[in-house]
Amino acid sequence: MLDTQQIKEIIPHRYPFLLVDRITEVEEGKRAAGYKNVTANEDFFNGHFPEYPVMPGVLIVEALAQVGAVAMLIKEENRGRLAFFAGIDNCRFKKQVKPGDKLELEVDITRARGTIGRGKGVAKVDGELVCEAELTFALGE
């Protein structure tokens, strides 16, 4: 298991854009799982929406991308590199994510060749699917 400090040693994201609290499982270059505890104090709830707070879907996808980045950047040969978001396909949102939810995040790397890779991301709350997407990333310096 990786805590927030250990995650920050692998990916460059910082508050308020670090969207993963813990990595619970990781297989270098193959898959990673983790979670974000969504609190009422998240900055994005100030405007999305003040009377009905819902986590923006793009931030759910970004959280998935960060988990996928951990799977790739934890590999010794990728340490110190960046994982850039290069595309999203077949993204679907099934349920809303609200304050108090524990957003469970899983990414399976389906393809990695050179500096380009793809992963299948799934986000759940209480075991129920809230988002799924195919993510494309590019590794850079």
From Swiss-Prot:
GO terms for molecular function: (3R)-hydroxyacyl-[acyl-carrier-protein] dehydratase activity. The active site is at H48. It catalyses: a (3R)-hydroxyacyl-[ACP] = a (2E)-enoyl-[ACP] + H2O. Pfam families: FabA (PF07977). Its main location: cytoplasm. One of its GO terms (biological process) is lipid A biosynthetic process. SUPFAM superfamilies: Thioesterase/thiol ester dehydrase-isomerase. CDD domains: FabZ. InterPro entries: FabA_FabZ, FabZ, HotDog_dom_sf. It is an enzyme of class 4 (lyase). Its EC number is 4.2.1.59. Coiled coil: none annotated. Involved in unsaturated fatty acids biosynthesis. Catalyzes the dehydration of short chain beta-hydroxyacyl-ACPs and long chain saturated and unsaturated beta-hydroxyacyl-ACPs. This is 3-hydroxyacyl-[acyl-carrier-protein] dehydratase FabZ.
